[in-house]
């Protein structure tokens, strides 16, 4: 009787349960087995006719609502009754056949059935307390003495179960749909917040002096996003926009100044490449001429020198881009350009908001954010900077910086390295000259004897007490064995030289004894 196919109404199930209680008085074990087969512990329903085992409602995925709002869904019709039945009946309550628990489960639908079908009784008859319950691990429900206490226990248990399941569902459901909704929302809010033209120089300086925490707080206040997506990917204040030209696209389109303007809506959703960040500040092309004034470019602010020959997009970490955002005020674009980007490329680049650092050889020729098909140039607008109309036209012809402004950081960088080296060598030479200043006098005194030895001692680091050792041909450094060997070689050399001199004097017919008396 109870195992007949499930009718699509919880009220019919309720009526069958009441009729079963009145008619079947001695079939308790079979009733329990049928009830267990109808509602297994693994899933809510697998044998319940045409009702699908898992029913997902759009109301459950929005946000976890209070327990009273879940009961208010009962007024929507019998279809909502199925959903409320599947969402609100916990497994532990179904596994136990205690009448008090099941009575609490059927109470909201019973009150609803009173308004729709008057034949439904308001409450189920009470079963004898001697009935044996189906005991399963972690699903034992104790009997409550009165009905009100059981109702309170049920209300304290079910909302936490529902909220935990709904939180897990809402957290894992449809990440691509989340990304599309966030992107469409960022389109609307960025149009309202970001200006079309770059802000004036005093505003840029004021924004630049602000700490990074205030910038991130302002970004977080502009759009509320889930925690797995970084807010800096979608919205950046005007002070941290990335307006810098691209080398590869400037060669294709010499008539437009290709940049990251402040009015771009989707460009900041992908991490900026290394060439897009630094190509304008380190462009070493001799043919590129521009009328940029070097007063707006402070050379100490540029500290990165990437590879200028690499034209494909290189991905940097967010910390490097944050360092590069400090120079964004000096790279303001005079001609703002709006760039559009497809949703698929954004999802591919973003990689779920994890900011995965790609390989430097990773390129996207089809969905590149600077492709010529997506460029929509906007007419140049006047703003309070030092640019005039003629300078704007000149800049649009040559998108890179002037060689003077571009090479000034390198000149200062090279000069800061070369000048200390020059000072070191000069001071070393001065110290060497001061130490070996008394050497030429002594060397000239003994030049007749060992003139060839004075040439071979130019590499030695001189000290105040090395003059005798150096003149004897022994270097002041080395181990004890090396010093002994060199001293022995010096003595042999002096002895040979003296013997050769004596032979020369004797062969010339001179007096050797008189010469030794004069020299010694």
Curated annotation (Swiss-Prot):
InterPro entries the UniProt entry points to: WetA
Ranges annotated as biased composition (Basic residues): 420-429
UniProt biased composition (Low complexity): 261-294, 436-453
Keyword Transcription regulation in annotation: yes
Biased composition (Polar residues): 388-401
Keyword annotations: Activator, Conidiation, Sporulation, Transcription, Transcription regulation
Description of the deletion phenotype: Totally blocks pigmentation of conidia and leads to colonies with on a white tinge.
Biological processes annotated in GO: conidium formation; sporulation resulting in formation of a cellular spore
Region entry Disordered, spans: 110-149, 260-294, 388-453, 471-496
Transmembrane spans: none
Domain of life: Eukaryota
Keyword Glycoprotein on entry: no
Function comment: BrlA, abaA and wetA are pivotal regulators of conidiophore development and conidium maturation. They act individually and together to regulate their own expression and that of numerous other sporulation-specific genes. Plays a crucial role in pigmentation and conidial cell wall integrity.
Family: Belongs to the wetA family.
The protein, known as: Developmental regulatory protein wetA
Species annotation: Penicillium digitatum (strain PHI26 / CECT 20796)
């Amino acid at each position: 009787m109870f195992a007949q196919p499930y009718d699509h109404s919880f009220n019919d199930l309720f009526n069958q349960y009441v009729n079963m209680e009145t008619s079947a008085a001695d079939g308790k074990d079979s009733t329990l087995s049928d009830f267990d087969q109808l509602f297994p512990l693994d899933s809510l329903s697998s044998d319940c006719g045409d009702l699908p085992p898992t029913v997902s409602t759009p109301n459950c995925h929005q946000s976890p609502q209070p327990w009273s709002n879940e009961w208010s869904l009962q007024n929507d019709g019998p279809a909502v009754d199925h959903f409320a039945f599947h969402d609100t009946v916990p497994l532990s309550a179904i596994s136990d056949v205690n009448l008090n628990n099941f009575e609490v489960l059927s109470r909201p639908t019973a009150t609803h059935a009173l308004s729709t079908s008057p034949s439904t009784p308001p409450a189920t008859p009470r079963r004898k307390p001697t009935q044996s319950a189906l005991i399963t691990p972690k699903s034992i429900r104790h009997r409550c003495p009165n009905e009100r206490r059981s109702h309170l226990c049920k209300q304290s248990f079910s909302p936490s179960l529902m909220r935990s399941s709904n939180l897990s569902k809402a957290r894992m459901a449809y990440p691509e749909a989340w990304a599309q909704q966030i992107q469409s929302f960022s389109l609307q809010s960025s149009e309202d917040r970001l200006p079309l033209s770059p802000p004036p120089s005093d505003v840029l300086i004021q924004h630049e002096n602000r700490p990074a925490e205030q910038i991130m707080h302002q970004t977080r206040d502009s759009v509320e996003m889930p925690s797995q997506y970084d807010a800096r990917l979608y919205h950046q204040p005007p002070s941290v926009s990335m307006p810098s030209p691209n080398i590869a696209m400037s060669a294709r389109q010499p008539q437009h100044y290709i940049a990251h303007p402040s009015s771009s809506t989707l460009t900041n959703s992908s991490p900026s490449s290394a060439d897009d960040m630094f190509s304008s500040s380190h462009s070493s092309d001799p043919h590129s001429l521009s009328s940029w004034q070097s007063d707006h470019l402070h050379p100490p602010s540029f500290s990165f020198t990437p590879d200028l020959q690499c034209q494909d997009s290189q991905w940097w970490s967010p910390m490097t881009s944050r360092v590069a955002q400090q120079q964004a005020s000096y790279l303001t674009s005079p001609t703002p350009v709006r760039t559009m980007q497809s949703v698929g490329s954004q999802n591919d680049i973003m990689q779920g908001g994890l900011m995965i650092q790609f390989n430097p050889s990773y390129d996207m020729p089809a969905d590149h954010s600077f492709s010529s098909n997506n460029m929509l140039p906007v007419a140049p607008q006047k703003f309070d900077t030092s640019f005039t109309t003629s300078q704007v036209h000149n800049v649009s012809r040559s998108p890179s910086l002037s060689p003077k402004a571009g090479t000034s950081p390198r000149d200062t960088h090279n000069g800061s390295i070369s000048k200390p080296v020059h000072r070191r060598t000069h001071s070393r030479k001065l110290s060497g000259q001061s130490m070996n200043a008394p050497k030429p006098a002594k060397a000239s005194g003994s030049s007749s004897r060992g003139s060839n030895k004075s040439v071979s001692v130019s590499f030695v680091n001189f000290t105040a007490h090395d003059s005798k050792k150096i003149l004897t041909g022994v270097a002041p450094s080395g181990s004890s064995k090396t010093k002994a060997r060199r001293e022995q070689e010096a003595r042999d050399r002096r002895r040979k030289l003296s013997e050769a001199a004596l032979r020369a004097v004797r062969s010339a017919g001179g007096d050797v004894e008189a010469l030794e008396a004069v020299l010694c």
